[in-house]
A protein has these predicted regions:
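Short N-terminal edge-element motif at the start of the domain
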Residues: 1-33
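A sequence-composition feature that detects small, non-aromatic residues
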Residues: 2, 7, 19, 42, ...
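Contiguous surface segments at macromolecular interaction interfaces
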Residues: 52-170
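Short beta-strand-centered aromatic/proline hotspots
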Residues: 29-31, 36-47
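Short, solvent-exposed loop/turn segments at secondary-structure junctions
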Residues: 24-26, 47-49, 124-125
């Protein structure tokens, strides 16, 4: 996670879990507050600087196709260290974050790497039973909400791994 949610990226600790939920505003699966479904769950395993991320995760950089008109969306590694001033970054061309988002993205200071994740998608999110739903923000937040005991919820997600569109389950 290298873009958006700067406060969450600054404050999240290694070992924390991050969950993405449907919402009223999600065009493909709008859901009412209190009825949100799980889009993804990911365990933070590393916090890297943007420079470290740039060097270690070349495969997460968007690239132009052969006709140089279309950019293939491979990921969020869009901030290249400035060779003349390594504390500054150059935003590479991409299809999802304009220059107007750069300051906000870089305020996050870190990129969160999640080596264990479960992606259900916004088109087929996972329904979580009421008794094990974690704390979910009522409105969009930049920092998230902490759930003290999320073990039952995490185990439920792991038991439904066959419904994932993509996973790197451990």
């Amino acid at each position: 996670l290298a873009t958006c949610k700067p406060a969450m990226r600054r404050n999240t600790k290694i070992g924390n879990w991050i969950a993405g939920w449907t919402s009223k505003q999600l065009k493909d699966s709008p859901t009412e507050v209190g009825k949100e479904k799980l889009v993804y769950l990911a365990k933070v395993t590393q916090k890297l600087s943007f420079a470290e991320y740039w060097e270690k995760y070349e495969q997460k950089r968007p690239v132009k196709t052969e006709d140089t008109k279309v950019i293939q969306r491979y990921g969020d590694n869009i901030y290249k260290p400035n060779p003349t001033n390594p504390k500054e970054f150059i935003q590479i061309e991409n299809n999802f974050h304009g220059k107007d988002k750069m300051d906000k993205d870089l305020r996050g200071e870190y990129v969160l790497i999640c080596e264990e994740f479960y992606y259900f998608s916004r088109l087929s999110p996972l329904d979580i039973p009421d008794g094990m739903r974690p704390n979910i923000p009522k409105v969009q937040t930049s920092y998230g909400v902490i759930t003290k005991d999320a073990a039952e919820f995490i185990n439920y997600v792991k038991q439904h791994v066959e419904l994932c569109k993509y996973t790197d389950a451990k």
